[in-house]
């Protein structure tokens, strides 16, 4: 039975996927646009279930159908998500023990709600962070988002089992862990 590789990228404004055969030829491609929530000045969010997981599942179904293959023929899945580079930072979503998002995901460095938390972290850890990571604390750092949730959404923080990036969220949904 011929095997296939599937890759899906969840981006800021769209998600795209590709199914590639053993011969490294593209069997199917699919792209879907999605929105981004901007509820307040400087805030940028995604609904992790709807956008990240929903797009992942929808694109997967489309690729399998368009490729005319059985799901069992997929031997490898690669997933990438928005804002996971060093320059822009990571997105962050708090989840409960069943991987259910407790609020909207805070996007990578484009979300600037955590200014007070950046200042606090810089006062307390700035010198060490710059030495260890080569850059000052910024809005893209996951720690700023976690501290913002702790300070501004204490009930969400209290109920949080884990804070996940987009890639971690997709992995947790796929594996159940």
Regions found by a protein language model. Name each.
Residues 1-104, 131, 159:
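N-terminal glycine/serine-rich phosphate-binding loop of ATP-dependent small-molecule kinases
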Residues 2, 10-12, 88-89, 95-98, ...:
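Gly/Ser/Thr-rich active-site cleft segment
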Residues 45, 120-125, 177:
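Short, surface-exposed amphipathic charged segments that create phosphate/polyanion-binding patches used
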Residues 56, 114, 142:
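Conserved donor sugar-nucleotide recognition element shared by glycan-biosynthetic enzymes
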Residues 94, 116-120:
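Pocket-flanking alpha-helical
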Residues 111:
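Carbohydrate-associated surface elements
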